[in-house]
Amino acid sequence: MLHHVGIEIAPADIEAAAGFFELIGFERVEPPPTLSEFTWLEHEGTQIHLMPEDEPTVPSPGHLAVVAPDFDAAVARLRDAGFKVQPKREHWGKPRVLAIAPGGHRVELMAAPPAAQV
Protein backbone atom coordinates (compact mmCIF):
# COMPACT_ATOMS: atom_id res chain seq x y z
CA MET A 1 0.00 0.00 0.00
CA LEU A 2 1.33 3.42 -0.93
CA HIS A 3 1.61 5.65 2.14
CA HIS A 4 2.78 8.98 0.72
CA VAL A 5 4.36 10.90 -2.12
CA GLY A 6 6.74 13.74 -1.28
CA ILE A 7 6.75 16.64 -3.73
CA GLU A 8 9.35 19.41 -3.66
CA ILE A 9 7.72 22.74 -4.43
CA ALA A 10 8.71 26.40 -4.28
CA PRO A 11 7.47 27.99 -1.04
CA ALA A 12 5.44 30.54 -3.04
CA ASP A 13 3.50 27.68 -4.71
CA ILE A 14 2.66 25.64 -1.58
CA GLU A 15 -0.82 27.10 -0.97
CA ALA A 16 -1.80 26.87 -4.63
CA ALA A 17 -0.59 23.25 -4.79
CA ALA A 18 -2.48 22.36 -1.59
CA GLY A 19 -5.59 23.97 -3.06
CA PHE A 20 -5.20 21.90 -6.24
CA PHE A 21 -5.10 18.64 -4.30
CA GLU A 22 -8.06 19.75 -2.15
CA LEU A 23 -10.07 20.25 -5.36
CA ILE A 24 -9.60 16.58 -6.24
CA GLY A 25 -10.56 15.18 -2.84
CA PHE A 26 -7.56 15.45 -0.51
CA GLU A 27 -7.85 17.06 2.92
CA ARG A 28 -5.14 18.76 4.91
CA VAL A 29 -3.76 16.84 7.86
CA GLU A 30 -1.35 17.97 10.54
CA PRO A 31 2.25 16.81 10.07
CA PRO A 32 4.28 15.87 13.13
CA PRO A 33 5.90 18.82 14.94
CA THR A 34 9.32 17.90 13.54
CA LEU A 35 7.97 18.42 9.99
CA SER A 36 5.82 21.48 10.62
CA GLU A 37 7.26 23.31 7.59
CA PHE A 38 5.64 20.71 5.30
CA THR A 39 2.02 20.75 4.13
CA TRP A 40 0.39 17.33 4.30
CA LEU A 41 -2.79 16.21 2.56
CA GLU A 42 -4.54 12.86 2.77
CA HIS A 43 -7.21 10.88 0.96
CA GLU A 44 -8.25 7.38 2.03
CA GLY A 45 -4.96 6.72 3.81
CA THR A 46 -2.64 7.99 1.07
CA GLN A 47 -0.81 11.22 1.75
CA ILE A 48 0.86 13.92 -0.31
CA HIS A 49 3.65 15.80 1.44
CA LEU A 50 4.36 19.21 -0.07
CA MET A 51 7.95 20.02 0.85
CA PRO A 52 9.06 23.65 0.50
CA GLU A 53 12.30 23.93 -1.46
CA ASP A 54 13.80 27.19 -2.72
CA GLU A 55 15.17 25.39 -5.79
CA PRO A 56 12.84 22.43 -6.31
CA THR A 57 13.89 19.58 -8.54
CA VAL A 58 12.44 20.00 -12.02
CA PRO A 59 9.26 17.89 -12.17
CA SER A 60 9.85 14.56 -13.86
CA PRO A 61 7.97 13.66 -17.04
CA GLY A 62 6.19 11.02 -14.97
CA HIS A 63 2.92 11.63 -13.17
CA LEU A 64 0.90 10.93 -10.07
CA ALA A 65 -2.43 9.14 -10.66
CA VAL A 66 -5.36 9.79 -8.32
CA VAL A 67 -8.79 8.13 -8.25
CA ALA A 68 -11.45 10.79 -7.71
CA PRO A 69 -14.44 9.69 -5.60
CA ASP A 70 -16.67 11.93 -7.77
CA PHE A 71 -14.73 12.22 -11.03
CA ASP A 72 -17.08 14.62 -12.84
CA ALA A 73 -17.30 17.00 -9.89
CA ALA A 74 -13.51 16.97 -9.39
CA VAL A 75 -12.91 17.76 -13.07
CA ALA A 76 -15.48 20.58 -12.90
CA ARG A 77 -13.81 22.04 -9.79
CA LEU A 78 -10.41 22.01 -11.51
CA ARG A 79 -11.82 23.73 -14.60
CA ASP A 80 -13.72 26.28 -12.50
CA ALA A 81 -10.46 27.07 -10.69
CA GLY A 82 -8.76 27.77 -14.03
CA PHE A 83 -6.76 24.57 -14.47
CA LYS A 84 -6.47 23.09 -17.95
CA VAL A 85 -7.80 19.55 -17.95
CA GLN A 86 -6.79 17.37 -20.88
CA PRO A 87 -8.94 14.30 -21.56
CA LYS A 88 -6.86 11.18 -22.16
CA ARG A 89 -7.66 7.96 -23.97
CA GLU A 90 -9.84 5.74 -21.81
CA HIS A 91 -8.45 2.55 -20.40
CA TRP A 92 -10.66 0.08 -18.53
CA GLY A 93 -13.75 1.79 -19.98
CA LYS A 94 -13.54 4.74 -17.57
CA PRO A 95 -12.60 8.37 -18.24
CA ARG A 96 -9.36 9.97 -17.14
CA VAL A 97 -7.78 13.40 -17.54
CA LEU A 98 -4.39 15.00 -17.08
CA ALA A 99 -3.82 18.32 -15.31
CA ILE A 100 -0.72 20.25 -14.30
CA ALA A 101 -0.61 21.12 -10.60
CA PRO A 102 1.11 24.27 -9.33
CA GLY A 103 4.84 23.64 -9.45
CA GLY A 104 4.52 21.82 -12.78
CA HIS A 105 3.72 18.32 -11.55
CA ARG A 106 1.54 16.19 -13.83
CA VAL A 107 -1.51 14.65 -12.15
CA GLU A 108 -3.75 12.05 -13.80
CA LEU A 109 -7.28 12.01 -12.44
CA MET A 110 -9.12 8.71 -12.92
CA ALA A 111 -12.78 7.77 -12.57
CA ALA A 112 -12.01 4.25 -11.35
CA PRO A 113 -8.88 2.42 -10.26
CA PRO A 114 -7.43 -0.09 -12.71
CA ALA A 115 -7.79 -2.94 -10.19
CA ALA A 116 -11.55 -2.39 -10.08
CA GLN A 117 -11.71 -3.02 -13.82
CA VAL A 118 -9.61 -6.18 -14.04
Language model: regions and residue ranges:
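Core segments of cupin and vicinal oxygen chelate
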Residues: 8-47
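Structural preference for long, well-ordered alpha-helical segments within the folded cores
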Residues: 19-23, 77, 103
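Short hydrophobic/aromatic beta-strand micro-patches
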Residues: 8, 65-69, 100
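N-terminal beta-strand motif that seeds the catalytic metal site of vicinal oxygen chelate
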Residues: 1-18, 62-64, 115-118
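Mid-chain, well-packed structural core segment of small domains
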Residues: 62-83, 89
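Short hydrophobic/aromatic beta-strand element in the GNAT-like acyltransferase core
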Residues: 38, 47, 65, 96-98, ...
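Vicinal oxygen chelate
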Residues: 81-118
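Short glycine-enriched loop/turn motifs at secondary-structure junctions
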Residues: 1, 56-61, 91
